[in-house]
Each structure stands twice: as C-alpha cells, then as structure tokens.
C-alpha cells in the first residue's frame, strides 16, 4: 500500500462517495474509475487488515486533554482496526511487570502502582503509570505487533 498526499477538495470528493462505513479510499477510487484490483489477495495478507491511519488523525488526538487520554484513544483506535490480532499485545512486558492484560486484577498483581485503565471499547487493560517516553515505546511495540512497518509504527507513536 502506498501513501499519497492529495488536496483537500479531492479528499472531500472521494470521501463524499463513500457507500459504507470503513470503505477504503482505494475501494472508492476503484469504483469511481471503474478499475478492478490488480493486486492478488494473497499479497494483502502481509499488510495490516485495516490501517489505523484511516481512523486516526491529529485533530481527534489533540482533543484528548491528557497524555493518558491520548494514549488510551490511540490504543482504542488500534484495537478497532485490529480486534482479532490485538491479543498479541499481551506479550508486551517490562522487566518487572506486565503492560497489558484482559483484566484490571491481572495488572494490579504485577505492581501496586500501575494505575490500570481499560482501553475504551475493548476487553483489554493497560498500565498508565509510566512516563510519556515509555508510553511512546509501548505504542511502537503495539503497532509492530499488529503488523505495521517501523516507519508507520513511529508515526503512530508520534500521535502521542
């Protein structure tokens, strides 16, 4: 998948021709141009099923009032894009504690100052009592676990 920059008026035009929620810009353009996909389906399996960049934008992130709120918002967008793969984040751990779990209790057992919070609209919990640098590192690890290339993982991290 390639990324291109387009003018706002073209973006608005493409977005106005969306037929269903979650339809990608590529699908809309193929339909508008009456072009079939030239890529075989097997190749698309190496890329994430849906890109978080289709849902996540700077303005939405900046509305969140704190670093923790932004952190949880970004994680929730990653979960929404990759719900079936998200359980892979359970493998992300620190030296002495677990970072992600399916329950608050599981995180509390790995430390009494973890301040666990539920990732919105997901069954997963994450520790939030870390500094911003550690939260950025965690976001990078999550993105890489979900199949994003390093450059895209860094872009996701930089939303924080």
Swiss-Prot record:
InterPro entries: Arc_rbn_hlx_hlx, Ribbon_hlx_hlx, SeqA, SeqA_DNA-bd_C, SeqA_DNA-bd_C_sf, SeqA_N. It is found in: Cytoplasm. One of its GO terms (cellular component) is cytoplasm. Transmembrane segments: none annotated. Keywords: Cytoplasm, DNA replication inhibitor, DNA-binding. GO terms for molecular function: DNA binding. Disulfide bonds: none annotated. GO terms for biological process: negative regulation of DNA-templated DNA replication initiation; regulation of DNA-templated transcription. It comes from the Bacteria. The keyword 4Fe-4S does not apply. Belongs to the SeqA family. Homodimer. Polymerizes to form helical filaments. Negative regulator of replication initiation, which contributes to regulation of DNA replication and ensures that replication initiation occurs exactly once per chromosome per cell cycle. Binds to pairs of hemimethylated GATC sequences in the oriC region, thus preventing assembly of replication proteins and re-initiation at newly replicated origins. Repression is relieved when the region becomes fully methylated. This is Negative modulator of initiation of replication. It comes from Idiomarina loihiensis (strain ATCC BAA-735 / DSM 15497 / L2-TR). The lineage of its organism: Bacteria, Pseudomonadati, Pseudomonadota, Gammaproteobacteria, Alteromonadales.
């Amino acid at each position: 998948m390639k990324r291109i920059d387009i003018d706002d008026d073209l973006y608005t035009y493409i977005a106005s021709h969306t037929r269903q929620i979650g339809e990608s810009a590529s699908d809309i353009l193929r339909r508008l141009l009456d072009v079939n996909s030239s890529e075989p389906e097997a190749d698309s399996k190496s890329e994430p099923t849906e890109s978080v960049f289709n849902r996540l934008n700077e303005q939405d992130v900046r509305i969140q009032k704190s670093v923790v709120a932004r952190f949880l918002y970004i994680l929730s967008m990653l979960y929404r894009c990759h719900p079936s793969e998200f359980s892979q984040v359970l493998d992300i751990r620190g030296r002495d504690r677990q970072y992600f779990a399916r329950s608050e209790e599981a995180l509390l057992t790995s430390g009494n100052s973890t301040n666990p919070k539920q990732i919105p609209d997901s069954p997963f919990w994450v520790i939030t009592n870390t500094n911003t640098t550690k939260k950025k590192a965690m976001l990078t690890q999550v993105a890489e676990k979900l199949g994003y290339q390093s450059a895209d993982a860094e872009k996701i991290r930089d939303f924080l």
